[in-house]
Curated annotation (Swiss-Prot):
Component of the ubiquinol-cytochrome c oxidoreductase (cytochrome b-c1 complex, complex III, CIII), a multisubunit enzyme composed of 11 subunits. The complex is composed of 3 respiratory subunits cytochrome b, cytochrome c1 and Rieske protein UQCRFS1, 2 core protein subunits UQCRC1/QCR1 and UQCRC2/QCR2, and 6 low-molecular weight protein subunits UQCRH/QCR6, UQCRB/QCR7, UQCRQ/QCR8, UQCR10/QCR9, UQCR11/QCR10 and subunit 9, the cleavage product of Rieske protein UQCRFS1. Residues 63-82 are mitochondrial intermembrane. The chain crosses the membrane at residues 44-62. The modification N6-succinyllysine is found at residue 33. Residues 1-43 are mitochondrial matrix. This is Cytochrome b-c1 complex subunit 8. Belongs to the UQCRQ/QCR8 family. Disulfide bonds: none annotated. Its main location: mitochondrion. It comes from Mus musculus (Mouse). Component of the ubiquinol-cytochrome c oxidoreductase, a multisubunit transmembrane complex that is part of the mitochondrial electron transport chain which drives oxidative phosphorylation.
Length: 82
């Protein structure tokens, strides 16, 4: 553990590759390829993903409406009250 920098342990069979930060581009072809690719993937998958979400939304709203309606009193029960 007490080794100094430059005299570190030798590690075998480990290969690491790196690229200088000065040679990298932050967003290469972000606007020319990235955004159109997202749109293409969305268009391809929308018919597979959207129907379950629509069904869940409709069931959720129906359930909330039924719950709110079940909390209300029935006016027919109180017609003869004075």
């Amino acid at each position: 553990m007490g080794r100094e920098f430059g005299n570190l342990a030798r590690i075998r069979h480990v290969i690491s590759y790196s690229l200088s930060p000065f040679e990298q581009r932050a967003f290469p072809s972000y606007f020319s390829k990235g955004i159109p690719n997202v749109l293409r993937r969305t268009r391809e998958r929308i018919l597979r993903v959207a129907p379950p979400f629509v069904v869940v939304y409709l069931i959720y709203t129906w359930g909330n409406q039924e719950f709110e309606q079940s909390k209300r009193k029935n006016p027919a029960m109180y017609e003869n009250d004075k």
